[in-house]
Amino acid sequence: PILKIDSEGNVVASFGGGLMLFPHGLHVDPDGNVWVSDARGPDEEDLSQAGKGHVVIKFSPEGEVLLTLGEGGVAGDGTGATLNTPCDVAVGPDGSIYVGDGHEGQNTDDPSTVARIAKFSADGELIASWGRWGSGPGEFKTPHAVLFDSQGRLVVADRGNNRLQILDQEGNFIEEFKQFSRPSDMHFGLDGMIYVADSESAFNPSPNPGWTPGIRVGSLEDGSVSYFIDGAIEGHDRYPDGSNPEGVAVDAAGNVYGAVVSRGGAMVRSVRQ
């Protein structure tokens, strides 16, 4: 389910339980609606999973399902409105919906793997689709997170290529930044700085040798990195306890929260003010 937690860590609301297999990306639009991507498909041997996964769901602030993108339980081929392990979702300045589609690109050398941005109208009709698996400009190896900057540019955490890509709203490549390490998630603070979470650089073997997992804070104006919140601990297990912030958010008071994957499950930790 989706959990709403207050500043003291208390769960104050819960919704969406049983609707999703792997709730992955989360976006709250200006109206308070909650968008969630379900980045996994059903296990054919588990009948309880039938018809679930491969979708993006829009919830009202109270948890009512308002819209579904994709077809539940059906994996798309990267060309139409049917999605395939969608990673993340963001609503653009004009109300269009942008989905980072394809979670498996970083784990394969198959160029047919889905790795794209799918653009939908506000009522869920596919408008356009761009990108493919690869490492060139406008190509992706897992578009793991998406969001818009203050200029209306689409920022993509192209995790498998260890970079942020900046695109316009029609998918045209503008620039890239590799100094934010291997990005799993991003958030813009009220100060205009971008906060980028790296959850994988300490894996063994490392997909990003020489880099330390954590949260890098900087500017997309000049690409500078001003601060680093260390997420590493001793050892190089895939999911070491207390490390690897895969999600990041900043509240109005400037507190930084890391969503941490660990052996015991997951947790949210306030890591800096």
Region locations from a protein language model:
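Sequence-structural signature of mature extracellular/luminal beta-sheet repeat domains
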Residues: 1-273
